[in-house]
Design a protein with these regions (language model features):
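Metal-cofactor-dependent catalytic cores
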Residues: 1-152
Length: 152
């Protein structure tokens, strides 16, 4: 059985620099991307375009968008001072609120990657992602706010 440890429900959080730039343009004080804790950050597709990526590929790794990421309170904490505020949640509520999960705000997308067998993982593919690697969007469409396979 596949399992997941030390993550917040999904192994990958995807966000774009343009999405953060859009958010920061609405805030009194800009915040860094690290507040959202993404492990894949892209640039060049436009603000919140990652919301619609059903399938994309980096090197030989196919990834699948599962659901938009409903944000907890962690991004409201300044990681340098440990001080909390109501931002960025308050601003996200003005334009990134859910339709189904109306109590939440969304930033980024929860993503899973394609599973392969040991041989192809070891010998046949480039399974490392590095800064600057190109991203190829294979399929776009509506991504749900919630997942039927996970509790939210």
């Amino acid at each position: 059985k596949d399992s997941l440890s030390f993550s917040d429900g999904y192994p990958i959080l995807l966000a774009s620099e343009e999405s953060l730039e859009d958010l920061n343009s609405r805030l009194k004080e800009a915040i860094p991307m690290k507040r959202f804790r993404p492990n894949v950050v892209v640039r060049g597709a436009g603000a919140f375009s990652e919301d619609r990526w059903k399938e994309f590929q980096i090197n030989d790794i196919k990834m699948y968008g599962v659901k938009r990421c409903c944000r907890c309170k962690i991004p409201t904490t300044n990681q340098l001072t440990a001080e909390r505020s109501n931002e960025p949640t308050k601003t996200l509520e003005t334009y990134r609120k859910g339709k189904v999960k109306t109590s939440g705000v969304f930033f980024g997308q929860n993503v899973i990657h394609e599973q392969r067998n040991w041989f192809s993982e070891t010998f046949l593919s480039r399974r490392t992602i590095s800064i600057g690697d190109p991203v190829r969007v294979l399929n776009e469409g509506e991504i749900p706010e919630t997942s039927k396979s996970k509790k939210n």
